[in-house]
Amino acid sequence: MAELYRFELKKCLQQKVLWITGGILLLCLCLWGAAACLQTTDSGLRGEEIIRLHREGGAALAGETVDQDMLDQFRPAYEKMVFAGDARELMGCIDIYEFLGHVLDTAASAEILAVDQQMLYDRLEDKLRTEAEKGSATEQAASYWQSKVQQQLSQPLVYGGYHEGWSQMASLMKVMTFLEVLFLSVALSGMFPQEAQHRTDQLILSSRRGRTALYTGKLLAGLTVGVGFGLLLLATLLGVTGLVYGLEGFGVSALFTLLMPLGASIGQVTLILFGAFLAAAAVTSLAAMVLSQVTRNSVATMGILVGILLLTTLITAVPESPRLLSVLWYLLPSNFVSLQGAFRYDLLSVGGLSLTTWQVTPVVYLLLTALLALGDWHIARG
């Protein structure tokens, strides 16, 4: 088995198109990092200067409570940007500005300038409770999330400091999934059609080792390539983000990035998405190989995968009703592995426990991976 696995893995890695595609996708990530530093924004500041000001300002505010004093510190910087067009000071407290905009659902200067501590917390609680009620499909889920809102706001929020690196990585996970699926559609679509094209099917079917061992070796090789490239993508993202934005702020509350009562830090949220991404890479790898086995055509397999990918990119949301449609839609890796896809208000009750979507879906992916492997093996035997 080990010998067959190594042979199939070597054969897969010898494809030039695999290295070309993977290299281009990794280069895209590196170019994203370079663009973040070099581009000039509407404020007239270069990206690297904005990051520096953001980091310095975040460090100065780290550990402070989000209260009237912080709002009073923020207001002069915002007024200077609005009335004088100078955004340098605002960059130091941009996290607070963006947080206010999300809570108030506006970018209007008059409303942001008028906000005080009481208004901010009232609007925040109202928004969190309304979103929880709207996103919950059952009374049990609504009750669960309302209790989470109460826990989150039981004491004033504390700004943990600069956390742009982790926030950027969490926001980019949908793009990362797009790159991964694109790679898999090229790298694995020819795994089984190659045997038919090269007229080696008969050799496989009559192998003294049996078809089970041969196809298991192929599946493991494809899985290694898919998950391995996923790890390489994550390592590149982590490296580029660390160089450009830095990796401080792991423990900052995720509420400053995603208005949802998760009770988790932005670093924890990002690691959850990393795990979901790898589980999605595994199930998509197996799905690509099953499709190539069924169609016996690499172009058809690639077309199906890319078609689904483009569909989920063009259609950003589906109605919550019927519920089954919404659940299946967000089960697709290109929809689930993102802040908005993974962190939703759906709950699954198991043995008295309330499990969230980001706890359940990666497990479902791993189960689907096993089922797809069995399905591919059954197709091969047939």
Question: Model features per residue range: what roles?
Answer:
Residues V17, G210-R211, N297-M302:
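Membrane-helix interface segments
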Residues G22-L25, K218, L305:
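Residue-level recognition of transmembrane alpha-helices
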Residues C28-M81, D116, L120-E195, T216-V294, ...:
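Secretory targeting signals
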Residues M1-T21, L25:
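Aromatic- and glycine-rich beta-strand/loop motifs that create alpha-glucan
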Residues V244-V252, A317-Q340:
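Juxtamembrane non-transmembrane "cap" segments at the membrane-aqueous interface
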Residues L188-L203, S207, R211:
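Transmembrane helix boundary and interhelical loop/hinge segments in multi-pass membrane proteins
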Residues A35-A36, T295-L331:
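Transmembrane helix segments
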Residues E8-K11, L291-V294, T361-G382:
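Junction motif at the cytosolic side of a transmembrane helix
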